[in-house]
Amino acid sequence: RRFDLPVRRFLLELAPFESFDLEMARMVSGDPRAGERLDWLLRYTTMLRYDDCQCFHFWSGFRAFLRWEMDREYTEEKRKALFSRGGLYYELKEDYAHALECYTSGGDHAKVSELLIRNAELHPGMGHYAEMEQYYRALPGAEILASPSLMQGMSMLCALSADYDGSEHW
């Protein structure tokens, strides 16, 4: 335990994410000194790596340790909140595939449905159907039937998959 509490907390809160940039580190951790912490970690440790000046990731063995430590120290509620903040970051960046992954990991079914509805309301050429297919298909039929937008999205997804009977069903 050679790190002080703010650095340990910062590390644990970034552990769920494969890679991150400074903006995501700030948003997920809520730490206004995220840039200083990243700089310190890069200078004085070997646990943090970067692909370019913007994209950081942990050495895989250290990330596994951080995730284990996070599971021990954080409540399920706290872990869900981290995934929710990560999902919001990706949503604001319009990276819906990663946003859905985060919201699903955090158990936020309402946000998953909201993103799928928003996607279905886009012009068909602008939708992200391939990236979101597993999330559409995981929705309960009753939930799809309750939303004309989700029915439209499922119909489009089925048509794009050459499942014309399924498309007609929705």
Give the location of each predicted region:
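C-terminal boundary/linker of central alpha/beta nucleotide-binding cores
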Residues: 1-71, 81
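Extended alpha-helical scaffolding segments used for macromolecular assembly and cargo binding
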Residues: 76-161, 165-170
